[in-house]
Amino acid sequence: MIKTRLARGGFSHRFIIKNMRYPVTLEPVEEGGYFVSFPDIPEALTQGDTREEALEMALDALITAFEFYFEDNEKIPLPGPVGQDYVDVPLSVASKVLMLNAFLDSKLTQIELANRMGVKKQEVTRIFDLRHSTKIDTVGKVASAIGHQLTLSIE
């Protein structure tokens, strides 16, 4: 099991994600196939001809919905309890979700974050782009700059 945690030093403000899994609802469609929705992320909707295809499409729909939260500077709801069906979010995306939520809690602007990190604002813009590959060390630097600590463990 891989665990990702973004903790705020001195506070009990912790985000612990063990395999960030978002529950999905698969509904059979009269014409055939399945309609997919996420109870925690209502914007993420998709469908597939088969159950397997629907679940494959679900991850892309979820990440696309996350992108809207990033663009709008809104916190991303964390996953609720998982039932029968779920989608595992890649750790690279999960770490950015936690990073965005903690950044928004900090009330800093991206310019202030860039200044604290000693980088240009364009670099911070790239960091907050889900489709841009960001090194985990960079996520750790963001965490530090906003008064948090990124902790990874393998159990």
Swiss-Prot record:
UniProt superkingdom: Bacteria
InterPro entries named in the record: Cro/C1-type_HTH, HicB-like, Lambda_DNA-bd_dom_sf, TA_system_antitoxin, TTHA1013/TTHA0281-like
Protein name: Antitoxin HicB 1
The family this protein is said to belong to: Belongs to the HicB antitoxin family.
Subunit structure, as described in the record: Probably forms a complex with the probable mRNA interferase HicA1 (its cognate toxin); when complexed with HicA 1 inhibits the toxin activity.
Cross-referenced CDD domains: HTH_XRE (cd00093)
Residue ranges occupied by any HTH cro/C1-type domain in the UniProt entry: 99-153
Keyword terms of this UniProt record: DNA-binding, Repressor, Stress response, Toxin-antitoxin system, Transcription, Transcription regulation
Function of the molecule: Antitoxin component of a type II toxin-antitoxin (TA) system. Functions as an mRNA interferase antitoxin preventing effects of the HicA 1 toxin.
UniProt DNA-binding region: 110-129
One GO MF term: DNA binding
